[in-house]
């Protein structure tokens, strides 16, 4: 199956938040107190209220939820210049569908995003992975389930939001959507 050809970028790159003063030896203005360093490069300059969320914490927790639920999945990881990261968990089960004369298989997908440069909020959503051709090209259709700004107070909200998305996925949304896809197939 085409899933063995999924992109596998390294997403667990070294990262830290350091004060600009410790890097430059000069004081910085209010609102630009810290630098986010990813894989040896400064990718963002942030205020002291910024909440840095390491990929190891976020993506490993998401994967552990799938493991604990005994779901079979394929993982695709995307690293955009050591500043923005995506992990897709493509669920392999009996609820896969084919469209257009058995071409274009559709599988359930959970997508999680995190960025160190501030361009994207940490988010997770439920969607679909569709094989368009055998080289693994895909399109996805999804709804954002949670999206959280990087502030110190909000970092405590991420793991409960992640758990909530996963519980709704297992409870009913996944099965309601697979029933709708089954109707489209007919």
Segments from the language model and where they lie:
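Feature for intrinsically disordered/low-complexity regulatory segments and propeptides
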Residues: 1-61, 70
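Intrinsic disorder/low-complexity polar-acidic segments
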Residues: 67-186
């Amino acid at each position: 199956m085409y899933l063995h050809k999924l992109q596998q970028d390294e997403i667990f790159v070294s990262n830290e938040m350091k004060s600009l003063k410790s890097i430059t030896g000069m004081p910085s203005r209010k609102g630009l107190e810290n630098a986010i360093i990813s894989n040896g490069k400064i990718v963002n300059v942030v205020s002291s209220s910024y909440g840095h969320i390491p990929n190891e914490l976020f993506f490993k927790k998401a994967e552990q939820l799938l493991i604990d639920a005994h779901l079979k999945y394929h993982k695709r990881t995307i690293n955009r210049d050591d500043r923005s990261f995506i992990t897709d968990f493509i669920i392999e089960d009996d609820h896969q569908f084919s469209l257009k004369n058995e071409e274009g298989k559709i599988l359930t997908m959970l997508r999680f995003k995190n960025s160190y440069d501030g361009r994207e909020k940490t988010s997770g959503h439920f969607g679909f992975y569709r094989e368009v051709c055998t080289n693994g090209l895909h399109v996805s259709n999804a709804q954002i389930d949670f999206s959280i700004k990087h502030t110190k107070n909000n970092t405590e909200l991420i793991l409960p939001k992640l758990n909530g998305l996963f519980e709704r996925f297992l409870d009913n949304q996944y099965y309601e959507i697979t029933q709708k896809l089954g109707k489209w197939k007919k």
